[in-house]
Amino acid sequence: MLLDICSPIDVASWQDQVDAVVCTWQGGQESGFSVADVLSGKVNPSGKLPMTFQIKYGDAYADKFFPANVDDKTLGAMFMWGYNKDKAPKDRQPQANIDFTNYEEDIYVGYRYFDSFGKPVAYPFGFGLSYTTFGYDNLTCTVDGDLVTVKVDVKNTGKCAGRNVVELFVAAPNSKKLNKPEKELRNYAKTCLLQPGQTETVTMTVKAEDLASFNEKASAWKTDAGIYTFMICSSASDVEAQATAKVKAWTKKVHNVMKPNVKLNLLRR
């Protein structure tokens, strides 16, 4: 199955009926040559999904913020009334998800939602197959002031040459209690073309400020001091190795702008 698409689609009705899926995206006039190179084995794919493919459309939390149970004619008229209020019925009141939308996912967008709330997915963020396989070993985390340096050995354990994208996710201490995502992507790196049996040491760094989240009450970006878990992943759902490091606190004071003028029922863990 070749997917010439630009965003996630519903895969529940067919994914168990195909042997393999290649997401080609929309590569333009040269796309056919690239796909042929991958399918023939001339090129070993090493791409990773930049979004989550949910099983069904309605699995995404944002589904509830799109117009529903409205026929096309009425929906079209409603949108036109938004541009030309003189033609709208005099007693018409603004309707949610037609005239305005209050997005309530807050920080739980994409993999942060599916991961933090334990929702099954078809293909997780960061997922992508290769014609070879890779192993991970000797993960280390070294702290120097506000900088954490992460190193891991990546070995081609398969039978053909290939590149691998190493994804570094980080989990904050007490993430659920503090209403933070289960883990977040904080860096990534790609290996060179590794021959079968070849190993490369991949190095990535994370600053304390990279781990900050916004504290609304304090109007500040804050990183809490504590023990953070650094995870080497092959996708948001697949942790290959992990280690911990003690991170110092970090704060950057800012000021409120564009504060909502209505109370939002934001999603919380």
Listing of model-derived features with the role each one plays in the protein:
Residues 2-163, 190, 224-225, 229-233, ...:
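Secreted, periplasmic, or luminal enzymes acting at the cell surface/secretory milieu
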Residues 34, 238-243:
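Extracellular and select intracellular beta-sandwich modules with Ser/Thr-enriched
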Residues 176-216:
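Intrinsically disordered, low-complexity Pro/Gly/Ser/Thr-rich segments with frequent PxxP/GP/PP motifs
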Residues 205-236:
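Short, surface-exposed ligand- or partner-binding patches at beta-edge/loop junctions that are enriched
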Residues 147-149, 199-203, 240-242:
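Intrinsic-disorder/low-complexity, polar/charged segments enriched in Ser/Thr/Lys/Arg/Asp/Glu/Gln
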Residues 157-177, 182-183:
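Short acidic, flexible loop segments centered on an aromatic residue
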Residues 155-157, 171, 205-209, 248:
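Solvent-exposed residues in well-ordered beta-strands and their adjoining turns
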